[in-house]
Amino acid sequence: MKKTAKQIGAYGEDIAEKYLKKRFWRILSRNYLAHGKEIDIIGYRFGVLTYFEVKTRSNDLYGKPSDAVDYQKISNIRTCARDFLNTYRRGGRIPVFYPFGIEIPRKIYKQRIDVIEIYLSPDGEIREINHIKDWEKKL
C-alpha cells in the first residue's frame, strides 16, 4: 500500500528524532504548534536551542528536500519559536529533561534553524540523512 505524504513525513520525523538522539540531542518537543504554524522537532545540545525542519523524499520528482524550506517556512518557524520561548523560557533558561524524569534548567547560548533531509528508497529504506545546520544563513 502506498503511503500518503503525511505518513511519509511522520516516518521521516521518527527517523530524524532517532538520528538526533544518537548524537546526544535532547528532544524538547515534536510537532510544536502555535498560531497555526508548526516546528517538527525542537532540540537542545551544548547550549544550542535548535528548531528542526524535517523534509523526507522517496523520489526526486520535487527536487532536494531542503528546496521546500523557503523564507515563508522560516518565518513560520520563527513565529512558533517565539511562542515556545515565551511559554518555556525562564531567566534565559529552558527546562531540559534527562533520564528518570530529571528536569534541569539549561542556559540558551545560541538558537538556530536546521534542516534534516531524509532520502528514502521506494520501499521505505533509509538511503541518506543530511543534517544542514544554520539553514537561514544558506538561503
Predicted regions and their residues:
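Acidic-basic catalytic patches of nuclease active cores, encompassing PD-(D/E)XK
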Residues: 1-31
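Conserved catalytic cores of phosphodiester-cleaving nucleases, focusing on short active-site segments
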Residues: 20, 41-61, 77
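Short, glycine/acidic-enriched loop or turn micro-motifs at the edges of active sites
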Residues: 32-34, 56
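Short strand-connecting beta-turns/loops that link adjacent beta-strands
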Residues: 35, 46-48, 123
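Catalytic cores of nucleic-acid endonucleases
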Residues: 56-122
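Short, low-complexity, polybasic intrinsically disordered segments
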Residues: 112, 117-139
